[in-house]
């Protein structure tokens, strides 16, 4: 008989964050280097952001049946690629979680960055969005797995932030390229439903 170590109640309750979502200096630099290598401007002031909006470099996030924005979103604009990510990810989130995705932040000029923001934050470019992190449970499990999979595919760089709690997503799709996401809902559901390889001998 194959012995399996018992799992404590504390271990069962403690949510597990995939390694891909752990924040690090390397992760920050990857996002920053992407922005620099694609010559993305870092907007300094709200006026600079308004100019980018007027020129069509940033597009509005308006919300729909699959995603919503909190009132705290000061500038509900992002690059076309970041918006395409939200539009593609939100329906899968709704299917998996039964509730709309919530965007808590998007493009943000450097002069409006919070005091604890990293100097190399890419929010001033518009390629990043912050999402509300679901409470512990099946939805959070799905979100973590989905973001880790998309990061492994090189489409995004994601971090599960703690102060304040949220999910930071930078969309690493070159400007002018369409964002196409795999069907993560069905894939992760199939993985979760697969029988465990650890069986007691009969």
PLM feature spans:
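Envelope-exposed proteins and targeting segments
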Residues: 63-67, 71, 97-99, 125-129, ...
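Extended, low-complexity, intrinsically disordered C-terminal regulatory tails
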Residues: 84-116
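Catalytic cores and adjacent binding grooves of peptidoglycan-active enzymes
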Residues: 7-11, 119-202
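Long, contiguous hydrophobic alpha-helical segments, chiefly transmembrane helices and signal peptides
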Residues: 79, 101-109, 129-131, 169
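A mature extracytoplasmic/lumenal domain signature
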Residues: 65, 105-108, 133-135, 173
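Stable alpha-helical elements in mature extracytoplasmic
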Residues: 78-85, 89, 139-146
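Extracytoplasmic cell-surface/polysaccharide-interacting catalytic and binding patches
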Residues: 4-85, 162-164, 176-199
């Amino acid at each position: 008989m194959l012995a399996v170590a018992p799992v404590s109640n504390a271990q069962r309750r403690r949510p597990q964050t995939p390694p891909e979502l752990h924040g690090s200096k390397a992760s920050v630099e990857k996002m920053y280097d992407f922005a620099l290598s694609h010559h993305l401007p870092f907007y300094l002031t709200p006026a600079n952001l308004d100019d980018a909006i007027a020129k069509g470099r940033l597009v509005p996030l308006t919300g729909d049946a699959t995603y919503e924005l909190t009132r705290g979103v000061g500038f509900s604009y992002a690059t076309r690629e970041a918006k395409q990510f939200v539009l593609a990810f939100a329906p899968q989130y709704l299917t998996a979680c039964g509730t709309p995705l919530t965007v808590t932040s998007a493009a943000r000029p450097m002069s409006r960055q919070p005091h604890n923001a990293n100097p190399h934050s890419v929010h001033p470019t518009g390629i990043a969005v912050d999402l509300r992190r679901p409470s512990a449970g099946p939805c959070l499990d799905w979100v973590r797995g989905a973001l880790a999979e998309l990061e492994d595919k090189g489409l995004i760089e994601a971090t599960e932030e703690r102060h304040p709690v949220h999910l930071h997503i930078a969309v690493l799709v070159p400007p002018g390229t369409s964002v196409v996401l795999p069907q993560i809902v069905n894939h992760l559901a199939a993985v979760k439903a697969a029988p465990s390889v650890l069986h007691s001998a009969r």
